[in-house]
C-alpha cells in the first residue's frame, strides 16, 4: 500500500511531490546561470527541463541508464524538452552514474535527485559521488537529493558525511528533506522519503 500510495503522490494527477521536490532543488541553486549543468539520473527530464527554463543562458546534459523498470526513455526526454522549447540547449545521454562518459571539470552545476540509491554498478556510494564531483569545475556547485540516511544503502550517516568531506570539495551542507518541505505522513515512511537528505556544496 505504501508504494502504491507514494506512486500516486508523485504522479502529476496526484499532489505532484516530484515537482515540489524539483522546485526545492532549483531554489537551492546559488549560481548566475551562465554555463553547463549536468543532471545525473534525469528520468523523464523533468528536473533538467525546469533548470533549463529557470536558467535560459545555460547548456544542459542529462544522463540516465533508462532501465527496463522505468517507463522513461531518451526519446521521451527529448520530446519533453522540445515541448517546453528548450531542446536546443539540452542534450541527453544513456550512461551509468558510476562511469560518466564526461571530461573532468566540465560542469558549473551538477544535480541528482533520487538516483544514487538505485545505481547497481557499484556498491561504493562514496565512489559514486566522487565520480559526480569529478566532472564538476573547481568552484562549481552540486545539489544531490537521495535516501542518504538509509544506512542499509549508504552506511552510517555520520561516517558517510565524514567520508564525503574528504573528497575534492570545499564546502558541504546537509539538510533533511522533511525539514525543508512538508510531506504527507506516508511519504515520511523510511521506505519512501523518510530517509531523504539534500547534500549541497562546492568543489
Per-segment meaning from a language model:
Residues 85-97:
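Conserved SAM-binding strand-loop segment of SAM-dependent methyltransferases
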Residues 181-203:
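Core SAM-dependent methyltransferase catalytic element
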Residues 139-146:
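Conserved beta-strand signature within the Rossmann-like core of class I S-adenosyl-L-methionine
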Residues 44-56:
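Conserved SAM-binding loop of SAM-dependent methyltransferases across substrates and taxa
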Residues 33-43, 61:
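Conserved class I S-adenosyl-L-methionine
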Residues 126-138:
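A short glycine-rich, Lys/Arg-flanked "PGG" loop and its adjoining helix->strand segment in the class I
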Residues 98-110:
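A short acidic, Gly/Pro-enriched loop at the edge of an enzyme's catalytic core
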Amino acid at each position: 500500500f505504501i508504494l502504491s500510495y507514494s506512486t500516486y503522490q508523485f504522479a502529476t494527477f496526484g499532489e505532484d511531490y516530484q515537482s515540489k521536490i524539483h522546485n526545492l532543488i532549483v531554489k537551492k541553486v546559488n549560481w548566475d546561470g551562465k554555463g553547463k549543468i549536468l543532471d545525473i539520473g534525469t528520468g523523464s527530464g523533468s528536473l533538467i527541463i525546469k533548470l533549463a527554463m529557470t536558467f535560459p543562458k545555460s547548456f544542459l546534459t542529462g544522463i540516465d541508464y533508462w532501465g527496463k523498470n522505468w517507463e522513461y526513455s531518451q526519446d521521451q526526454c527529448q520530446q519533453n524538452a522540445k515541448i517546453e522549447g528548450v531542446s536546443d540547449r539540452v542534450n541527453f545521454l544513456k550512461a551509468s552514474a558510476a562511469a560518466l562518459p564526461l571530461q573532468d571539470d566540465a560542469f558549473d552545476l551538477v544535480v541528482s535527485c533520487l538516483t544514487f540509491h538505485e545505481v547497481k554498478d557499484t556498491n561504493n556510494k562514496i565512489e559514486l559521488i566522487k565520480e559526480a564531483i569529478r566532472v564538476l569545475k573547481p568552484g562549481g556547485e552540486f545539489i544531490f537529493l537521495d535516501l542518504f540516511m538509509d544506512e542499509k544503502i549508504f552506511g552510517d550517516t555520520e561516517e558517510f558525511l565524514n567520508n564525503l568531506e574528504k573528497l575534492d570539495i570545499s564546502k558541504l551542507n546537509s539538510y533533511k528533506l522533511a525539514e525543508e518541505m512538508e510531506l504527507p505522513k506516508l511519504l515520511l515512511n523510511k521506505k519512501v522519503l523518510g530517509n531523504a537528505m539534500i547534500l549541497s556544496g562546492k568543489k
